[in-house]
């Protein structure tokens, strides 16, 4: 009986020593004040803020950050030289928010962005170069069909721009030049019939615009010069319709801010 008590006391002592040694190895800095080894930082309420490893003040290996509700905020896996990191970032509810790669703390290559309200719903996929969008950008509906595609050059919208209905039919087709809508601007009903067609010149309506009925017949013809219609007698409803369409064109929400895409 006494032997059991002595043995238990010995094991407890060993465990306490190990814990003390482990704690003493945390949050170390070298003579130059640089973080080295295993670091755990906590919020004022003692909840862990981050848990990771440093070498010469730079993060290496797995590095985890947490929200104050203890949910994982991000997991970054750093290269040995700390220049590259594979990132998985999470919403505060635990759903995945985005995935991609950093090089020198800048987004690089393909990045994916996910919904805050539907777990795993991929909203957007974009290509980055030195933290700027370059190449094709795709937005998706919850069933993974494409909602929109357009291209970027150094974070500026350039080239063809297409939006789709959930059934795959084209909703809108136009193009950008230096981040402004430029050239033909066509919109279709979900049944595939033309809804309106017109022309933009540097984000301003220009030339002949036609509005169609759902059966494809022409409802109105309007002539624009520098964004001003010559047809001042047209019904106010149709004028407001075009104004609203212009206001909302391309307003699929920023995938980094919301999990909803406008149909």
Task: Please describe what each predicted stretch is.
Residues 19-263:
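Glycine/tyrosine- and acidic-biased, solvent-exposed loop/turn segments at the edges of beta-strands
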Residues 1-26:
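Bacterial Sec-dependent N-terminal signal peptides
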